[in-house]
Amino acid sequence: MGKAMLRAGFADTNSSNMNESFARLHFAGGYLPSDSKDWRTIIPSLLMAVCLVGLVGNLCVIGILLHGVWKRKPSTIHSLILNLSLADFSLLLFSAPVRAAAYSKGVWDLGWFICKSSDWFTHVCMAAKSLTFVVVAKACFAYASDPAKQESIHSRTIWSVLAGIWVVASLLPLPEWLFSTTRRHAGVEMCLVDVPAVAEEFMSMFGKLYPLLVFCLPLLLAGVYFWRAYDQCKTRCTKTRNLRDQMRSKQLTVMLLSTAIISALLWLPEWIAWLWVWHVKAGGPMPPQGFIALSQVLMFFTSTANPLIFLVMSEEFKAGLKGLWKWMITRKPAVTSEVQEAPAGNTEALPGKAPSPETQTCILDTDGRGSPDDSKEKSGKVVAPILPDVEQFWHERDAVPSAQDNDPIPWEHEGQETEGCN
């Protein structure tokens, strides 16, 4: 998540001078020097397991939402959920592997660009998620108040809101991009935050305001809007006849509220560690390395928990997953045998096509001219023939209309026809 620690020292007690020099360093990019081989194995393994499960879950959610966009006009809430899933997918695809690689090595060998952009990119995705929670909570409240109103929002408005979220999220952690760099210290290549003296006051203010702007205020506003939306759903469900939309609104509100609460709880240890290392006093205790490492694992686990919540709590996502699976199966290439003609001697039509009455008659005539053995074999499949006199009767009736058909008062002649027959 940002800095692994602000003032950290190696566990090696044999070199006190080295510890004193390391205590003044600001590590960045997930780089956390440690002499423990267990931590270098456990933390990367946990990160990769979380990464694999989360990538599969987010791919399912993204596929369901994109399949829905392809079939119909995207809704505001679905577009915002898609934005959440894209942020989670980006975190797991780009940031988690970098953290795993940084933890597994005692030196930084991932290059200058990754060192400079790692913390910035991680915070961009987290800020985008926090801002998206605020917007989706506001959309849930609007949908609970008037479900029909949400359908009238133009697609350009939705994409403009999403673009604005990512622009703001990119600007908030920009100081981390400016001051993160690689340095060689005590013969070891490290990823550090090198703050010049003229910018120390600015970075001190940044350390106080950034968690407030990215974590506290957005989730507080989102919680208020979610609670109002939930209360609105309970009120309107007792007064409206359109219970289907209200039940859907309540389900979406509960699902997204659960996602916001889980995200806040899993982010909390990381922000505690972040504030601890930024505001520790000179000579004060530093957070344990294990706490810092596990807090970052929990932060990435948030991106795995979100798609699981969507797929478990939403009936709409369950149905969408089934529909997406059926769509993927039915899009297989057509079998070439379906377009080929039926072979000779097997004239019982292609699969799925019923033969016409004329075809049935032709088959019957052909069978009649065949050998007796063939007739015996096909006796169970022969259709009853049309009698010649019946066929001639209907043919003459269709070809030559009778006078009775043109008689405007046929009931006057019914008695005469009966007498003539007698």
Swiss-Prot record:
Annotated compartments: Cell membrane
A biological process from GO: G protein-coupled receptor signaling pathway
Record field: transmembrane: 46-66, 77-97, 124-144, 158-178, 206-226, 260-280, 291-311
Any one GO molecular function term: identical protein binding
UniProt topology in membrane: Multi-pass membrane protein
Extracellular face residues: 1-45, 98-123, 179-205, 281-290
Listed PROSITE patterns: G_PROTEIN_RECEP_F1_2
Function text: Proton-sensing G-protein coupled receptor.
Protein name, UniProt field: G-protein coupled receptor 151 protein
Organism: Mus musculus
